[in-house]
């Protein structure tokens, strides 16, 4: 007995936690700073924490009411019908829902390179084939309609990330509209707005009002600080929103997740604090880090440091965990999550020391 051929599938390797790294290095986890996974520097919304505590005694019940309540809240927020909100177990769950709804075996998708690995992984799980469009470092990872269309060849799904991970680059609404107009009638353009709260540019949501070939992806993992409970959703055109009922898993978001999400949506103060601090950290990192950086609209900065693995390892030994971007095909770059003021300043100090030593 063996599984099907998985040789084309890659393994998603999430960043390691502070406790794991501390044990390996013999360090005190309380003395370490993790700025590697684009997590919220302030943790979860305090209101969400209270909602989780208050829901503990209801864990024997399936999340029917809370699921419906959260969908209604999100529908009001985005000015869509409840049917257009596809609630899921994290943003990756929303990607799976869209793949199940759209892909027949053997159909192609188009993904960015560098980019979020799970776009391709989800497509392959659903027996799709994967093609890539390239974001060029020489062009500062610019995201334009031409960036995508020059590599487009009739794929069923095209994935756009705005702001993009790991570069922080963005698509304009006009660029997304052009891509949707210039691709085939049966091509779905998925705009991943996981970092959408951190940008000053508006969401691409208005495109859904007059198009049936654009869908959005959103998550509670970043600005809301709820990565650990796995809660995300897609916003899809009304014309085919009813497909969710046919492809969704039973109770795709847990009772705890739904209750936390409802509370987090009302905690504007936590989101504003997170967004404002990230904006400060981006400016500080760009100004104070002794390495070239790219403008970013996310809660992170990409920097070119030479030997990314050496820099990341040396910083980690000094208690600062950042992301080596070799896995993105950028072995000369690191990604630094925006932290609190104290953590960001410490990270810059350590990284500048390490960069100087490695280059010496």
Swiss-Prot record:
EC number: 2.6.1.9
Domain of life: Archaea
Modified residue annotations for N6-(pyridoxal phosphate)lysine: 222
Keyword terms, alphabetized: Amino-acid biosynthesis, Aminotransferase, Histidine biosynthesis, Pyridoxal phosphate, Transferase
Any one GO biological process: L-histidine biosynthetic process
Names of required cofactors: pyridoxal 5'-phosphate
Enzyme class label: transferase
Catalysis performed (reactions): L-histidinol phosphate + 2-oxoglutarate = 3-(imidazol-4-yl)-2-oxopropyl phosphate + L-glutamate
Organism of origin: Haloarcula marismortui (strain ATCC 43049 / DSM 3752 / JCM 8966 / VKM B-1809) (Halobacterium marismortui)
Keyword Transferase (UniProt): yes
InterPro entries: Aminotrans_II_pyridoxalP_BS (IPR001917), Aminotransferase_I/II_large (IPR004839), HisP_aminotrans (IPR005861), HistidinolP_aminotransfase (IPR050106), PyrdxlP-dep_Trfase (IPR015424), PyrdxlP-dep_Trfase_major (IPR015421), PyrdxlP-dep_Trfase_small (IPR015422)
Family: Belongs to the class-II pyridoxal-phosphate-dependent aminotransferase family. Histidinol-phosphate aminotransferase subfamily.
GO molecular function: histidinol-phosphate transaminase activity; pyridoxal phosphate binding
SUPFAM superfamilies: PLP-dependent transferases (SSF53383)
Protein name: Histidinol-phosphate aminotransferase
Pathway: Amino-acid biosynthesis; L-histidine biosynthesis; L-histidine from 5-phospho-alpha-D-ribose 1-diphosphate: step 7/9
């Amino acid at each position: 007995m063996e599984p099907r051929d998985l040789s084309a599938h890659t393994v998603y390797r999430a960043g390691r936690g502070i406790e794991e790294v501390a044990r390996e290095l013999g360090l005190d986890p309380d003395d370490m700073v993790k700025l590697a996974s684009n997590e919220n520097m302030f943790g979860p919304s305090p209101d969400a924490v209270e909602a989780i505590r208050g829901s503990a005694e209801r864990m024997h019940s399936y999340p029917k009411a809370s699921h419906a309540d959260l969908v209604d809240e999100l529908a009001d927020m985005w000015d869509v019908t409840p049917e257009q909100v596809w609630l899921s177990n994290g943003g990756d769950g929303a990607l799976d829902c869209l793949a199940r709804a759209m892909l027949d075996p053997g159909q192609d998708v188009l993904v960015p390179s560098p980019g979020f690995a799970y776009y391709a992984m989800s497509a392959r799980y659903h027996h799709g084939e994967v093609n890539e469009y390239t974001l060029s470092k020489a062009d500062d990872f610019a995201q334009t309609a031409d960036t995508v269309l020059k590599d487009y060849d009739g794929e069923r799904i095209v994935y756009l990330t705005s702001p993009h991970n790991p570069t922080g680059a963005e698509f304009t609404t006009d660029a997304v509209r052009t891509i949707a107009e210039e691709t085939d009638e049966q091509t779905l353009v998925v705009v991943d707005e996981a970092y959408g709260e951190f940008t000053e540019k508006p969401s691409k949501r208005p495109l859904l009002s007059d198009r049936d070939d654009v869908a959005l992806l959103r998550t509670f993992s970043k600005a809301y600080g709820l990565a650990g409970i796995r809660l995300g959703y897609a916003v899809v055109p009304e014309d085919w929103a009813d497909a969710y009922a046919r492809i969704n898993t039973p109770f795709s978001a847990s009772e705890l997740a739904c209750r936390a999400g409802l509370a987090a949506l009302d905690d504007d103060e936590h989101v504003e604090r997170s967004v404002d601090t990230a904006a400060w950290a981006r400016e500080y990192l760009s100004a104070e880090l002794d390495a070239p950086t790219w403008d970013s609209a996310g809660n992170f900065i990409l920097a070119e440091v030479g030997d990314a693995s050496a820099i990341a390892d040396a910083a980690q030994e000094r208690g600062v965990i950042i992301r080596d971007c070799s896995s993105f095909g950028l072995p000369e770059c690191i990604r630094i999550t925006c932290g609190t003021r104290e953590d960001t300043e410490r990270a810059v100090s350590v990284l500048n020391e390490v960069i100087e030593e490695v280059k010496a």
